[in-house]
């Protein structure tokens, strides 16, 4: 139990990445991420699954971490600025990967095109969509 002087820990932070302050440039980066979140939402709707609200955070560049997802409770993903600058194909792959973690509690899997722990050189978007839908159907069945 907390006393009156203890604060509830902030839930919009992660130990691994530092959130960027919102300004016009960060807002534009966030819109790019949101575009892919909406794509995932529409993809799930096409098979009759409603996607809950997911918080999106843009973080400082990190050479080793492209994204982080919160599992359970408040749904949130953190996307590193470095993956946003890699291009749309890599950004979409990373967003779908992190959404699969936070929405379906999907673990990393070496042979899986979407859920492998290392980022592929050239992600296959159609294969990623197929795996994303398979994970969604398995989670909701």
Can you say where each PLM-predicted feature lies in the sequence?
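Metalloprotease/metallohydrolase-associated module, dominated by Zn2+-dependent proteases
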Residues: 2-5, 10, 18-19, 23-82, ...
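Surface-exposed, interaction-prone regions with an acidic/low-complexity signature
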Residues: 13
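Active-site recognition of the HExxH zinc-binding catalytic motif
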Residues: 93-105
């Amino acid at each position: 139990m907390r006393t009156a002087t203890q604060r509830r820990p902030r839930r919009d932070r992660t130990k691994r990445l530092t959130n960027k302050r919102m300004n016009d440039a960060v807002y534009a980066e966030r819109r790019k991420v949101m575009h892919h979140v909406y794509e995932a939402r529409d993809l799930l709707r096409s098979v009759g699954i409603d996607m809950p609200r997911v918080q999106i955070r843009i973080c400082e560049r990190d050479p080793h971490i492209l994204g982080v997802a919160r599992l359970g409770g408040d749904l949130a993903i953190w996307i590193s600025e470095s993956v946003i600058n890699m291009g749309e194909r890599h950004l979409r792959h990373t967003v779908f990967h992190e959404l699969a973690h936070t929405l379906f509690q999907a673990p990393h899997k070496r042979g899986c095109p979407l859920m492998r722990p290392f980022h592929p050189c050239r992600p296959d978007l159609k294969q990623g969509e197929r795996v994303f839908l398979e994970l969604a159907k398995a989670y909701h069945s």
